[in-house]
């Protein structure tokens, strides 16, 4: 059993979940190193709270497994798709319904643009941990890599050559718009005090 961080998940179960995550990750901006950084932050933040660490670890490992579906169809929300995929996978490998549902809820609400904010402490910690990986220079670098993968420009200009700060219907979403919409606002959107301090 893995007993670090106050949890008792069987090592074989942890390895199964990790292997499933590794099989699903093929995006340079949301690769396994992103997942491991999110997991590290989640476990660090969780030291201050009484949380279900098995749920938190599974949610951290599986939170981006819906990315490939979103790449194939940009209308999809990777958090919603990933939540369903994670739930199905956890049930398949023998997780209890309540824990699998809890992981599903954490993943479904981890996205910055999610209409439903995270409710449980595990979900709030996952959200904060994922957003920590979007802060600072690393966050900017990851966003530029992602924009390259999905073939979106660094910035858009209007007919007069002025850089557009917001999205409009005539232009693709750009890095500059993502920075203005998300990256510079992250620091006021954390749920835990520790994440705010780390950021």
Please identify what each model-predicted range represents.
Residues 1-8:
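Short, Lys/Arg-enriched N-terminal segments with co-localized hydrophobic residues
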Residues 86-127:
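Hydrophobic, well-structured mid-protein blocks that either form specific transmembrane helices
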Residues 12, 24-51, 62, 115-199:
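Divalent metal-dependent phosphate-bond-processing catalytic cores, especially two-metal-ion Mg2+/Mn2+ enzymes
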Residues 53-72, 78, 82, 86, ...:
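His-Asp-centered metal-binding catalytic motifs of divalent-metal-dependent phosphohydrolases/nucleases
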Residues 14-18, 39, 79, 83-87, ...:
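An amphipathic alpha-helix signature
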Residues 20-25, 68-71:
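A short, mixed-charge helix-start or loop-turn motif at secondary-structure junctions
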Residues 22, 39, 43, 66, ...:
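Amphipathic alpha-helical segments within well-ordered protein domains
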Residues 28, 72-76, 93:
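Short gly/ser-rich anion-binding loops that grip negatively charged ligand groups
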């Amino acid at each position: 059993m893995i007993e670090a961080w106050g949890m008792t998940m069987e090592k074989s179960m942890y390895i199964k979940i990790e292997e499933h995550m590794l099989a699903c990750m093929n995006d340079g901006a949301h690769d396994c190193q992103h997942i491991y950084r999110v997991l590290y932050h989640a476990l660090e933040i969780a030291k201050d709270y009484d949380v279900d660490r098995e749920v938190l670890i599974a949610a951290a490992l599986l939170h981006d497994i819906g990315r490939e579906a979103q790449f194939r169809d940009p209308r999809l929300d990777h958090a919603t798709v990933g939540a369903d995929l994670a739930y199905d996978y956890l049930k398949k490998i023998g997780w209890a319904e309540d824990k699998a549902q809890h992981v599903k809820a954490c993943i479904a609400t981890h996205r910055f643009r999610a209409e439903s904010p995270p409710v449980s402490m595990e979900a709030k910690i996952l959200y904060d941990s994922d957003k920590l990986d979007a802060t600072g220079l690393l966050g900017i670098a990851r966003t530029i890599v992602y924009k390259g993968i999905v073939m979106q420009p660094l910035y858009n200009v209007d007919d007069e050559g002025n850089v557009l700060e917001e999205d409009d219907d005539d232009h693709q979403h750009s890095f500059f718009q993502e920075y203005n919409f998300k990256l510079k606002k992250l620091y006021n959107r954390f749920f835990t005090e520790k994440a705010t301090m780390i950021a």
